[in-house]
Amino acid sequence: AIWKQLRALEALGLEIESVKGFGYRPPDSFELLSKATILNHIAESHGDLPCELEIFQSIDSTNRYARERAEAEAISGTVVLAENQTAGRGRLGKTWVSPFAANLYMSIVWNFDQGAESLQGLSLAVGVGVRRTLVELGLQDVQLKWPNDIYIGGKKLGGILLEMIGDPNGRCTVIIGIGLNVAMPSLA
């Protein structure tokens, strides 16, 4: 029944509008991630990259899942995206509020051969890359705040969470988590 589907969407935090005489509709700013669109954009702008892309409607944490994939020998460059996280995490174990289809929740698996010492400054390098991308997309006044925050116009836009697994003195894998508050609802 339609009401079960509506309840399932509401359970994800998506407000469904009832339009008398017409039915139901999602909010106007509703847009889901598209694997085909993302892969086409990557191919057009960077050529074919040897990466794997996984998109979830809902997941507990993209970083947790990416970590599991890395422990199962995922290829370097594996990207995990989600429309919703039920247990998103920020730095120092803080909760990362992750409403459905409102923001960007992404984790990247990346392998390094030189160990933890060679990773000094990685958080800053990732932040610079995110900032550069946002500026290329037309955003202005994008700033980085040490150690992992991204701001626009003095307001927090997102954050970066790095987690390392493997040998601190040799081959290791870093899970690079990036969360961006694209369309954060005012109640979140």
PLM regions and their residue ranges:
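Short flexible/disordered coil segments
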Residues: 89-91, 141-147
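Hydrophobic residue at the +6 position relative to the catalytic HRD Asp in the kinase catalytic loop
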Residues: 24, 149-151
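N-terminal lobe of the biotin/lipoate ligase/transferase fold
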Residues: 3-136
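Long, positively charged amphipathic alpha-helical accessory segments at protein N-termini or as interdomain linkers
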Residues: 1, 7, 11-12, 114-142, ...
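Solvent-exposed beta-strand sheet faces enriched in polar/charged residues
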Residues: 17-19, 145, 163
